[in-house]
From Swiss-Prot:
CDD domains: sorbitol_DH. It comes from Neosartorya fischeri (strain ATCC 1020 / DSM 3700 / CBS 544.65 / FGSC A1164 / JCM 1740 / NRRL 181 / WB 181). GO terms for biological process: D-xylose metabolic process; L-arabinose catabolic process to xylulose 5-phosphate; sorbitol catabolic process. The gene is xdhA. Its EC number is 1.1.1.9. Binds 1 zinc ion per subunit. This is Probable D-xylulose reductase A. The keyword Amino-acid biosynthesis does not apply.
Length: 358
């Protein structure tokens, strides 16, 4: 990890194996298509998936077999544009959507490109991520930031896009009650988006009191710390303490924890909607009887799709969602590994890594 930032062309933070990272100077990527742009990356957030690859070397079927650049929550400044680019120019500040679909398969043509089987997603093996000085994207996957959104905030458009997709999957409407399990970055942003969509009650659930305290200050109308009792008992408490009557309209799970899934199913009203946004173990026990007899709508949510990033930028630009308060630390590029260690230790909410300084 000794490569000099002063002489490097495209210094990159590379994962070689479990807890094995290095700074490597790589060639500046070429524009492969006339619609491509070269982005000078300015800020990158550390995501739980990045930490998981660093800790375990894999996520499910995605295994790091070759050295891979980490990072996918980024913002930057346009450094070069292809000959067919019309919507961006050198110097524009952008949020970067880090997955490129094939654009030809049925999900892509149906507007669900997040389900594309040929998706080239940053920092998902075998594709390199954005923790480098430069990164290439198609122009339509770069979203120009208005003047009132900073580049630091721009890096949070990625997790906000995830939250927007989850809340849209839930079809949250004004006046509804929404329970969000998991008060990490995505769960907190789900609370904020649900509030922007007009939800009347937004209840954040977590086992860590500091997270709940922040959630209450941030966007939740109330919070709930589960007791070490059955899911049915926790659901009963949730309903009574929050005057939910027969149950909540919407449950969003951003934790992936099996007890949260169980409690979420039991706390919903008949005909309610459940959206699974958090990933945990690949298989869990599931309260199928409650789901069936209450005729619940159950949906999964994966990354983000058509319109989600645009809406995310719009929510922040209009002041309806605040992402600035989630940024609890910014470190220099050469301290990237230490930042990963701190995130793994649960310090802060969202840590950003600053890009290479010219």
């Amino acid at each position: 990890m000794s490569t000099s930032t002063a002489t490097a062309q495209n210094l990159s933070f590379v994962l070689e194996g479990i807890h094995q990272v290095k700074f490597e100077d790589r060639p500046i990527p070429e524009l492969k298509d006339p619609h491509d742009v070269l982005v000078n990356v300015k800020f990158t957030g550390i995501c739980g998936s990045d930490v998981h690859y660093w800790e375990h070397g894999s996520i499910g079927q995605f295994v790091v077999k070759d050295p891979m650049v980490l990072g996918h929550e980024s913002s930057g400044v346009i450094s070069k544009v292809g000959s067919a680019v019309t919507g961006l120019k050198v110097g524009d500040r952008v949020a970067m959507e880090p997955g490129i679909p094939c654009r030809r398969c049925e999900p892509c043509k149906a507007g669900k490109y997040n389900l594309c089987e040929k998706m080239a997603f940053a920092a998902t093996p075998p594709y390199d991520g954005t923790l480098a000085k430069f990164y290439v994207l198609p122009e339509d996957f770069c979203y120009k930031l208005p003047d009132n959104i900073s580049l630091q905030e721009g890096a949070l458009m990625e997790p906000l896009g995830v939250a927007v997709h989850i809340v849209r999957q839930a079809s949250v409407t004004p006046g509804q009650s929404v329970i969000v399990f998991g008060a990490g970055p995505v769960g907190l942003l789900c609370c904020a988006v649900a509030k922007a969509f007009g939800a009347a009650k937004i209840i954040a659930v977590d086992i860590q009191k500091p997270r709940l305290d922040f959630a209450k200050r941030y966007a939740a109308t109330s919070t709930f710390e589960p007791a070490k009792v059955s899911a049915v008992d926790n659901a009963d408490r949730l309903r009574k303490e929050n005057n939910l009557g027969v149950g909540a309209d919407v449950v969003i799970d951003a934790s992936g924890a099996e007890p949260s899934v169980h409690t979420g199913i039991h706390v919903l009203r008949p005909g309610g909607t459940y959206v699974q946004g958090g990933m945990g173990r690949s298989e869990i026990m599931f309260p199928i009887m409650a789901a069936c007899t209450k005729e619940l709508t159950f949906k999964g949510s994966f990354r983000y799709g058509s319109g989600d990033y645009k809406l995310a930028v719009g929510l922040v630009a209009s002041g309806r969602v605040n992402v600035k308060d989630l940024i609890t630390g910014v470190v220099e590029f050469h301290d990237a590994e230490q930042a990963f260690k701190e995130v793994k230790a649960g310090k802060g909410i969202k840590t950003l890594i600053a890009g290479i300084q010219d």
